[in-house]
Regions:
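Extended catalytic/binding region for NAD+/ADP-ribose chemistry, centered on the ART fold
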Residues: 146-150
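Cell wall/extracellular polymer interaction/catalysis modules
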Residues: 1-144, 155-167, 171-178
Length: 178
């Protein structure tokens, strides 16, 4: 993902076949409403710069054909963004935990964005205030609160391409690639 200095970006997928990297998809993307940063903070509207593995694939729709473990979201699924909760930056099933937070994304409440999505493994140490709930998800037609979004068709294509060792690189601009 390469930003343009604002909240637009280009997402490019490269696949390694027989030792050779090949571009297999390039598409328009949106990032945080306040751009991309190397100093992400909770609620800043910025997408975190860096290279990350990918976590749980999920969505309100059924598995679109990804080989990754798929969670079909229901009314009990939340991603906690309350910095004072022991569940900060974690996916939880409230039927198992109860509500032990003051703020969280109720995943089913975002039917367009989270029709198909995958977690970006950002802040997996759950450092309070460093940012939470960073996903690659379907576009809603506007900038995100810190996630990366692409069209639903591109999101499905990406999910189908994912391998277990897939990484996502997020860069502020082309110059920061080198």
């Amino acid at each position: 993902v390469v930003g343009n200095g604002g909240n637009y970006a280009t997402l490019t997928v490269h696949t390694k076949r027989n030792g050779v990297w090949t571009e297999t998809l390039s598409c328009s993307a949106r990032v945080g409403k306040n751009g991309i940063t190397g100093n992400k903070r909770e609620g800043d509207g910025k997408t975190p710069r860096g290279i990350y593995s990918l976590g749980q694939a999920f969505g309100l729709a059924g598995n679109p054909g990804t080989s990754r473990s798929w969670l079909q979201v229901n009314n009990n699924h939340y991603w906690v963004d309350d910095v004072n909760s022991s569940y900060y930056n974690k996916l939880v099933d409230a039927s198992q935990t109860g509500i032990q937070w003051n703020s969280a994304e109720h995943l089913i409440s975002y039917p367009t964005a989270y029709r198909y999505a995958i977690a970006v493994n950002y802040n997996t140490a759950c450092t309070r205030g460093a940012g939470s709930a960073i996903f690659l998800h379907c576009s809603t037609g506007r900038a995100t609160a810190g996630c990366i979004s692409v069209s639903q068709n591109d999101m499905v294509r990406i999910l189908k391409m994912l391998q277990g060792d897939t990484l996502i690189g997020i860069y502020q601009n082309k110059n920061s690639l080198y």
